[in-house]
A protein has these predicted regions:
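Domain-level detector of nuclease and nuclease-like folds
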Residues: 1-150
Length: 150
């Protein structure tokens, strides 16, 4: 299983931290994905909050039309994370298949938020102006990898 919002990232107060253990925050996630690529991305996101300022992160599962089930519980075919750095007007998206993926491979799954929207059917950050939303069509992994952003 995997937590969609990790306990280590939700430290606003006791109630918020405790809510990370609610069933609504848990999905059946491949253990190799959870311990490797997913954990690596979560660590990057925590570091980015120090390097790039406040981030707005949306996470969720993606299900096939006829999902595999384990004990009557649907297993996601993939998981997504979309990230917005408001101070810099930068967006980044990821979709990981629900399989074993190494931490070194996370950038192979980076994509524009617009591509994540197409895969999920969701519109992310819809309250932003059209001008800001226009940035969802591109991504710059090298910018996110840099550590000198303030």
């Amino acid at each position: 299983k995997g937590h969609l919002a990790p306990y280590a990232s939700v430290d606003f107060n006791y109630k918020s931290s405790a809510e990370t253990f609610a069933m609504s925050n848990i999905a059946l996630q491949n253990s190799g994905l959870n311990r490797k690529a997913w954990r690596s991305l979560e660590n990057h996101i925590r570091n980015w909050t120090h390097e790039k300022g406040r981030l707005v992160v949306v996470t969720g599962p993606i299900f096939n039309k006829l999902p595999k089930k384990v004990k009557h519980i649907s297993v996601p075919s993939a998981f997504y994370k979309v990230i917005y750095a408001p101070k810099h007007k930068r967006f980044l998206g990821f979709v990981f298949p629900n399989t074993d993926i190494s931490a070194r491979q996370i950038w192979d799954y980076a994509m524009p938020v617009e591509a994540v929207e197409k895969q999920t059917g969701y519109t992310f950050y819809s309250s932003l102006s059209r001008r800001k939303q226009a940035h969802k069509t591109s991504t710059d992994p090298e910018w996110w990898k840099r550590r000198d952003i303030a």
